[in-house]
Design a protein with these regions (language model features):
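Bacterial N-terminal signal peptides that target proteins for export
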Residues: 2-17
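Bacterial N-terminal signal peptides
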Residues: 13-27
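Bacterial signal peptide processing site
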Residues: 29-31
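Boundary at the C-terminal end of the N-terminal hydrophobic targeting segment
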Residues: 37-39
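Substrate-binding and catalytic surfaces of secreted/luminal carbohydrate-active proteins
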Residues: 42-64, 69-81, 190-192, 222-230, ...
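Residues that line or immediately flank small-molecule/substrate-binding pockets and catalytic motifs
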Residues: 97, 138, 245-246, 317-318, ...
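Short acidic/His/Gly/Ser-rich catalytic and metal-binding motifs that mark active-site loops
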Residues: 143-147, 198-205, 247-252, 294-297, ...
């Protein structure tokens, strides 16, 4: 549902009324006030700040009365946090600025609407949810308005010197939207993935299906480097590349190609890796960029002695297999990072009856508990018809929905699942040990490196409320979470009364 901010005078009045309500009735609940999120000034060290979203969105990032640390025994559902046991450091959360997303934001919103949305998504002030990680497509994906690469030539021709390479197809939407996001959040990390090499490099001579001809391994690596250089020149530094989106899949009606482990290892180890090594602007290479069901694929590349030194991480998608594959690969190669680089919500999920907690549990809690340093959902924005797209998924959902006629914004379950982490867990935060989930209550805990704040994200997937206790050190608090809801808890260690931001 669309949630435009109230006029300032009404928000101030509402806030005053709610504060009085809390003073005169301890049980009074605050309604949603997204602009309040993160406020912690004046809170005591015994208070735990709470934000809540329910599946029906009757409360959406609602600021709730704080929980309080108090002497009490643990409840049957108990979350024990061990801050001394630390795992990966977080890079960030976000979603992909696909061609479709950028086109809608740039061409179906007024300048005021566009600025407000981008500040909300990428900023940390006011209602900002602080996305600091995004993904771009190198050429077209299914969520483009047409099929293209960045070096298309007439049928029967080739361009091994890449003389016709151009990022002009992106100058009208992807580049200005991404630059605007970076302007709001200069710390934004941008990764990029091709859906297909240019058709003339492939066995099908088409963007559709096929694989890369070995004779063009070097040209394809240079194609990716030219993309990095061209985007840097456009004011968009690329943090990381993958060689191919979903390299074990050949879609029938949109760009794609197979690229097996042997080919990826050869391109990475003998071409792309050496080309990127030693550059002033470091660009990382992530392998795989596909589902959890084939961990042997990235393992094969990481076992290659020539390719492995150039691979910094494994990129994962959620559409097959189990998230434990991330831990399987991490156990074999603990020096290689893990990222969830794509997962889409869609019409196949139970709307307002579990989709929220499914997304939060599977993609925020489970992935980070299995070593993910960053989490990316798929389309940042789609329209009311789940587009625009040229082939592929017709039922995928964006993090936000933009009305193609009015530019109005609807925030989806994916938005709130991400926001409950992205707003509070900042770059460099440590994921710390916490109890496994039980009885429908799942969690993940973090310690922010910048201000020492503690962040706990909890879902209740059950159809009734759940009461649980949380212990951190010698301190304990208890909370009752409504059915099918998601909450974030923020506090500071004893002796520190800083804010929750």
């Amino acid at each position: 549902m669309t949630r435009p901010l109230l006029p300032l005078s009404r928000r101030l009045s509402l806030r005053l009324v709610l504060c009085v309500c809390v003073l005169i009735a301890a049980g009074c609940q605050l309604t949603s006030d997204r602009s309040q999120a993160g406020a912690g000034d004046g809170k005591t060290r015994d208070e735990v700040l709470v934000w809540l979203t329910t599946s029906d969105q009757s409360r959406a990032m609602a600021t709730m009365p704080p929980a309080v640390f108090a002497a009490q025994p643990p409840l049957p559902i108990h979350i024990h946090i061990d801050e001394g046991k630390r795992y990966q450091r977080m890079l960030g959360f976000g979603a992909a600025i696909t061609d479709a997303s950028a086109w809608l934001i740039q061409h179906r919103m007024s300048p005021g609407q566009r600025d407000a949305l981008l500040r909300e998504l990428f900023g940390r002030e006011g209602a900002g949810i602080g996305f600091d990680f995004t993904r771009l497509t190198i050429g077209a994906s299914d969520f483009s308005r047409s099929h293209y690469s960045l070096d298309d030539v007439p049928a029967g021709q080739s361009d091994p010197k890449l003389d016709r390479f151009s990022i002009d197809p992106n100058r009208g939407d992807v580049i200005p939207v991404t630059r605007a996001a970076i302007g709001i959040n200069p710390q934004l990390k941008v990764m990029a993935s091709p859906w297909s090499a240019p058709g003339w490099m492939k066995t099908t001579n088409s963007l559709i299906k096929g694989t890369l001809k070995p004779v063009y391994y070097d040209a394809f690596a240079r194609y990716l480097v030219k993309y990095v250089d061209a985007y840097a020149g456009a004011g968009i530094p690329i943090f990381a590349l993958t060689l191919q989106n979903e390299p074990a899949f050949e879609p029938d009606d949109y760009p794609g190609m197979r690229l097996g482990a042997q080919a990826r290892a050869a391109i990475t180890g003998r071409h792309l890796g050496p080309m990127l090594a030693g550059r002033k602007q470091k660009v990382e290479i992530f392998d795989w960029d596909h589902n959890w069901d084939k961990p042997h694929e990235p393992l094969a590349v990481l076992h290659d002695p020539v390719a492995a030194p150039y691979v910094s991480a494994v990129a994962w998608h959620c559409y097959g297999g189990e998230v434990s594959a991330q831990s399987q690969v991490h156990a074999a190669f603990p020096d290689k990072d893990a990222y969830l680089t794509e997962c889409s919500g869609g019409d196949w999920e139970p709307v307002r009856s579990g989709g929220l907690t499914l997304q939060a549990r599977s993609l925020i809690i489970d992935t980070t508990r299995h070593w993910a340093r960053g989490v990316l959902f798929w389309n940042l924005a789609l329209d009311e018809n789940r587009g625009p797209h040229a082939g592929g998924c017709a039922t995928c959902r964006g993090v936000v929905t933009i009305d193609s006629k009015t530019g109005a914004v609807t925030r989806t379950d994916d938005y709130y699942a991400l926001a409950h982490a992205s707003r509070f867990v900042r770059r460099g935060a440590w994921r710390v040990a916490s109890s496994e989930g039980r009885d429908g209550v799942d969690n993940v805990a973090f310690v922010n490196a910048d201000d020492g704040s503690r962040v706990l994200v909890v879902t209740n997937s059950a159809t009734d409320e759940r009461r649980f206790s949380v212990a951190t050190g010698a301190r304990v608090f208890a909370y009752t979470l409504p059915a099918r809801s998601l909450a974030t808890f923020v506090w500071h260690p004893e002796g520190d009364s800083g804010t929750g931001r």
